[in-house]
A protein has these predicted regions:
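Extended aliphatic helical segments
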Residues: 4-5, 44, 76, 81, ...
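Generic structural signal for well-ordered alpha-helices
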Residues: 8-11, 57-61, 99, 103
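A structural motif corresponding to the C-terminal end of an alpha-helix
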Residues: 13-23, 63-70, 105-109
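Substrate-binding cleft of secreted/luminal carbohydrate-active enzymes
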Residues: 49-93
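Aromatic-rich peripheral "rim/lid" segments of glycoside hydrolase catalytic domains that contact
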Residues: 85-109
């Protein structure tokens, strides 16, 4: 049986003050469902939505914005890990909304 955690609740644990340090790179997680690969001992982030991803992204940007330019990095996990329910590619449920969050917060800033 997978462990199911609400994304909104879990996302507070994604961020830490250490991410303000110059050599620490934040990781932004859009969606997570490891149950197809884990057979029982898995984690599912329930109700992962673009609006929560946007909030998580804004927090990561806040943590890197005052770092030297060559340390202003954040990782987004992951482009197309469909087997782990961890992806940004457009889908039938949210369309391009995850990509639009990135465009709004990073490209248009």
């Amino acid at each position: 049986i997978p462990k199911v955690v609400e994304y909104k609740k879990a996302s507070s644990f994604f961020e830490g003050d250490e991410e303000y340090e110059e050599n620490i790179i934040p990781n932004i997680i859009p969606i997570w469902d490891h149950s197809p690969r884990s057979r029982g001992k898995s984690l599912v982030l329930n109700h992962a939505e673009p609006s929560y991803f946007a909030r998580h992204m804004k927090e990561a940007i806040k943590r890197i914005e005052n770092k030297p330019l060559d340390h202003r990095l954040a990782f987004v996990k992951s482009w197309n890990e469909w087997a782990e329910g961890n992806y940004l590619e457009p889908d039938l449920h949210y369309g391009k909304r995850y990509l639009e969050v990135i465009k709004k917060n990073v490209v248009e800033g």
